[in-house]
Amino acid sequence: MKDLHPIFTTFKEEFPEIHAKNEDLGKEIHEESGPLPDKIRWLLKIAISAASQHMIALETHIEKGKEAGLTDQEIGHALLMLIQTVGFPAYMEAYAVFKKRR
């Protein structure tokens, strides 16, 4: 797959040895370290990058997830789960700070 973001290409050109080591680590973790099927691994990466607000990674993970066979419905459902898993807890923490100040 081609690089989705010019900054990634720039990083690879400026730091080829670090890039190669990062690629090796990523391959080891993604492909060789556990029993999860490929589609589930990409679905997890999509959810993690979205929850972490890493939009460049999210775009890449969606593309690779689609290549692994994820449907738009599966990806959309995973992202929808952010509302309760990320959004509501963030609200509750902010609300607790607000209430504590009164």
Annotate each language-model stretch with its function.
Residues 12, 34, 51-55, 69, ...:
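Residues at alpha-helix boundaries and short interhelical turns
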Residues 28-31, 67, 81:
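General structural signal for alpha-helix termini and helix-helix connectors
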Residues 53-79:
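Mid-chain, well-packed structural core segment of small domains
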Residues 1-40, 93-102:
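Acidic, glycine/proline-rich low-complexity segments that act as flexible tails and inter-domain linkers
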Residues 24, 47, 81-84:
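Residues within well-ordered alpha-helical secondary structure of globular protein domains
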Residues 72-99:
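C-terminal structural segments of small proteins and small subunits
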Residues 41-55:
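Amphipathic, charged-and-aliphatic alpha-helical interface segments
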